[in-house]
């Protein structure tokens, strides 16, 4: 049985064969927990293995494990978080009133049935975390939706560690969203349609004809889907995945959701209002593990460096997320490029088809081709290539991601 059931990924296929299937599931889960702890206890910590565990089916399994692994994925010292002093910043912060309004509207982000007093206390902590990070990093600008990311970390790791983790995240993965303008955010959204075009040109052309644009995916991207998913288990599963990957992985996941809903989109009236309304409502019963696997495959087959020219709408002076990610990876333990893994992925294609299938754009459905290639079966070479790819492609990112 797949590990996904522990993450609320929906019922698995087939029926229980006595206790055999349950025993198999428990054995896989126990094995994965042991592998995670082995990586944590290695000297130095085997961060590459932790990234693979975070990406692979089931993710990091429990919040207890996340409290240990998330700091490693972000290269944060969990034993020395910064002091909390956000309460002293409320009167002087220009963002306080907006943060307060957003936090007050965040009731549904807290577990149902949580005592009101406890929830109100957490909301106060949420405000303090945000204001402290903004005070310590004046180059960062608050945006509506930022609190949706912060509250996820708060609920999993607590106030003190959440401050350290979100601060690191804000200066790396989220950096483009925290510019004074939305130019870089819009540029990242511009990757969505080229990804869809590579996989399903028919769907791409339909959406272009409808002139739906990409604004429907804005809240997905800037909140890491925290604002639009009602089941907290799905949210933290995606955070496992995104924390282990390149900063642009959320836009690949957004593309995979659209591709998964292909028939619904094509059955819509071909107009902006109809398609936007459909896509802005994310189904809550998505096959998350399958979509995570496919997003990883697409990142490997169509890396950002190959899509940058299409995605670029105008010359970008800032290349913050891509350039800082290289420095971030260099600072993380056990992060080395692995050409063998990339070659293993390319070995899945016949030599005469490599250039034709990866770099050209035949008007066929590549989503089906990915499944046929078998890349999503166990996330093996593709997952490894995803976690190792950032350094290998870093020079291209710096030159081409924001051309």
Curated annotation (Swiss-Prot):
UniProt-annotated site: Arginine finger, residues: 105
Chain segments carrying region Disordered: 1-25
Transmembrane segments: 238-258, 367-387
Gene3D superfamilies: 1.10.8.1310, Ypt/Rab-GAP domain of gyp1p, domain 3
Single annotated GO MF: GTPase activator activity
Limits of the Rab-GAP TBC domain: 60-246
Subcellular location: Membrane
Site (Glutamine finger): 144
Protein's UniProt keywords contain Repeat: no
Annotated Gene Ontology cellular component terms: endoplasmic reticulum; endoplasmic reticulum membrane; endoplasmic reticulum-Golgi intermediate compartment membrane; Golgi membrane; nuclear membrane
Subunit record text: (Microbial infection) Directly interacts with the N-terminal amphipathic helix of hepatitis C virus (HCV) NS5A.
Disease the record associates with this protein: Warburg micro syndrome 4: A form of Warburg micro syndrome, a rare syndrome characterized by microcephaly, microphthalmia, microcornia, congenital cataracts, optic atrophy, cortical dysplasia, in particular corpus callosum hypoplasia, severe intellectual disability, spastic diplegia, and hypogonadism.
Protein purpose: GTPase-activating protein (GAP) specific for Rab1 and Rab2 small GTPase families for which it can accelerate the intrinsic GTP hydrolysis rate by more than five orders of magnitude. Also shows GAP activity for RAB18 GTPase. Promotes RAB18 dissociation from the endoplasmic reticulum (ER) membrane into the cytosol, probably through stimulating RAB18 GTP-hydrolysis. Involved in maintaining endoplasmic reticulum structure.
Name under which the protein is recorded: TBC1 domain family member 20
